Amino acid sequence: MQHKLLINGELVSGEGEKQPVYNPATGDVLLEIAEASAEQVDAAVRAADAAFAEWGQTTPKVRTECLLKLADVIEENGQVFAELESRNCGKPLHSAFNDEIPAIVDVFRFFAGAARCLNGLAAGEYLEGHTSMIRRDPLGVVASIAPWNYPLMMAAWKLAPALAAGNCVVLKPSEITPLTALKLAELAKDIFPAGVINVLFGRGKTVGDPLTGHPKVRMVSLTGSIATGEHIISHTASSIKRTHMELGGKAPVIVFDDADIEAVVEGVRTFGYYNAGQDCTAACRIYAQKGIYDTLVEKLGAAVATLKSGAPDDESTELGPLSSLAHLERVSKAVEEAKATGHIKVITGGEKRKGNGYYYAPTLLAGALQDDAIVQKEVFGPVVSVTPFDNEEQVVNWANDSQYGLASSVWTKDVGRAHRVSARLQYGCTWVNTHFMLVSEMPHGGQKLSGYGKDMSLYGLEDYTVVRHVMVKH
């Protein structure tokens, strides 16, 4: 397994403390990797800064060609990437290969095309004898911090728009799941000029802090927890860096009496438990109107009970393990606290799976109240709660009564209601009669404590640029 860092076009061993990388399906150590030292972090940033002098001036065509080559290489090595992701994250291998790899390739190809569509405002005269134009230029060095739930996908979401816009990047994957990012570094080093892409390994305190706080870094992009986002914003405040934050969610799923219950059940069974629920847009907070509440709980409970947890390399496995032992304990604690309320009923699941690995049973909890922690706090595991509601006004207020604002969905056959409710929901995305669907052409991002900035789409590309005014006297 490729375990070296990429700094200034060279694969080098880390010079810091060694950290174990685990297989969450077994709990075994896959390998140990040495972190980047403080000197290596500095070298990576300075290499990116030096490379920016030329890369920032390349034509969109050149950047497009590089991104397309990288997309092709990822596609050609799709099986290798899927196997690494499966071993390091516990994802079902078939899901990693069939779902994630094509989407990752598409992200790079989309931004390869988008690079050639980015332009500033046409020139105009707003002062006599002067012509103004608006430019969209790259910022410089971008420090990108990727999470552990979708390591390669999130690396793609961060690298593709930053590079397409003409920036240089220093990427730090999670120390829990670094293997696909390090493999990507190996393949990318011969496609991009030295220093344009740098990939480090290490913990937040030892590598993340010196990286995001480096004076040469102009922007920090994070997908992670609210706590990590708060830390980075505070840590970088003195240098007034631009920050791009995607900080998790607790998606409300609003099911009205007239909804297609079978579609809801099928949707939540898939979208609430995909990736073992380790997804910031997971359909995890259901509000069911009282007329269909009992039916939905019964049918959804039966459906969730059929979900199969198992070995990642088993074609029939639908849920793999959680990412780490520490996260397994967090999920278990959240469910135990829900049970202790006395009014929340476990319909199915509600316990760790016996045996090796960090498995938690797919869980459905009914009778949750609006103020319960299981409704208000992100669990980030295979745990879905159901809360009954009376009417539209009540459920919209409840859905918005959350610190999160990333994703939501509305299930109804009433088109007017779908538009009305969608317009009032304080979430970056609202799906109607579906959930979880993402495409490269549309923006993904939140509001409130879920963060700000957009991934994917032309909006995502613009986030990695600075708007500049040039005025010419004539």
Swiss-Prot record:
<comment type="pathway">
    <text>Amine and polyamine degradation; putrescine degradation; 4-aminobutanoate from 4-aminobutanal: step 1/1.</text>
</comment>
<dbReference type="InterPro" id="IPR017749">
    <property type="entry name" value="PatD"/>
</dbReference>
<feature type="active site" description="Nucleophile">
    <location>
        <position position="280"/>
    </location>
</feature>
<feature type="binding site">
    <location>
        <begin position="225"/>
        <end position="228"/>
    </location>
    <ligand>
        <name>NAD(+)</name>
    </ligand>
</feature>
<dbReference type="InterPro" id="IPR015590">
    <property type="entry name" value="Aldehyde_DH_dom"/>
</dbReference>
<dbReference type="GO" id="GO:0019145">
    <property type="term" value="F:aminobutyraldehyde dehydrogenase (NAD+) activity"/>
</dbReference>
<feature type="binding site">
    <location>
        <position position="280"/>
    </location>
    <ligand>
        <name>NAD(+)</name>
    </ligand>
</feature>
<comment type="function">
    <text>Catalyzes the oxidation 4-aminobutanal (gamma-aminobutyraldehyde) to 4-aminobutanoate (gamma-aminobutyrate or GABA). This is the second step in one of two pathways for putrescine degradation, where putrescine is converted into 4-aminobutanoate via 4-aminobutanal. Also functions as a 5-aminopentanal dehydrogenase in a a L-lysine degradation pathway to succinate that proceeds via cadaverine, glutarate and L-2-hydroxyglutarate.</text>
</comment>
<feature type="binding site">
    <location>
        <begin position="172"/>
        <end position="175"/>
    </location>
    <ligand>
        <name>NAD(+)</name>
    </ligand>
</feature>
<dbReference type="InterPro" id="IPR016161">
    <property type="entry name" value="Ald_DH/histidinol_DH"/>
</dbReference>
<keyword id="KW-0520">NAD</keyword>
<dbReference type="InterPro" id="IPR016162">
    <property type="entry name" value="Ald_DH_N"/>
</dbReference>
<protein>
    <recommendedName>
        <fullName>Gamma-aminobutyraldehyde dehydrogenase</fullName>
        <ecNumber>1.2.1.19</ecNumber>
        <ecNumber>1.2.1.-</ecNumber>
    </recommendedName>
</protein>
<dbReference type="InterPro" id="IPR029510">
    <property type="entry name" value="Ald_DH_CS_GLU"/>
</dbReference>
<feature type="active site">
    <location>
        <position position="246"/>
    </location>
</feature>
<dbReference type="Pfam" id="PF00171">
    <property type="entry name" value="Aldedh"/>
</dbReference>
<feature type="binding site">
    <location>
        <position position="209"/>
    </location>
    <ligand>
        <name>NAD(+)</name>
    </ligand>
</feature>
<dbReference type="InterPro" id="IPR016163">
    <property type="entry name" value="Ald_DH_C"/>
</dbReference>
<comment type="pathway">
    <text>Amino-acid degradation.</text>
</comment>
<comment type="subunit">
    <text>Homotetramer.</text>
</comment>
<dbReference type="GO" id="GO:0009447">
    <property type="term" value="P:putrescine catabolic process"/>
</dbReference>
<dbReference type="InterPro" id="IPR015657">
    <property type="entry name" value="Aminobutyraldehyde_DH"/>
</dbReference>
<keyword id="KW-0560">Oxidoreductase</keyword>
<comment type="similarity">
    <text>Belongs to the aldehyde dehydrogenase family. Gamma-aminobutyraldehyde dehydrogenase subfamily.</text>
</comment>
<dbReference type="GO" id="GO:0051287">
    <property type="term" value="F:NAD binding"/>
</dbReference>
<feature type="binding site">
    <location>
        <begin position="146"/>
        <end position="148"/>
    </location>
    <ligand>
        <name>NAD(+)</name>
    </ligand>
</feature>
<dbReference type="GO" id="GO:0019477">
    <property type="term" value="P:L-lysine catabolic process"/>
</dbReference>
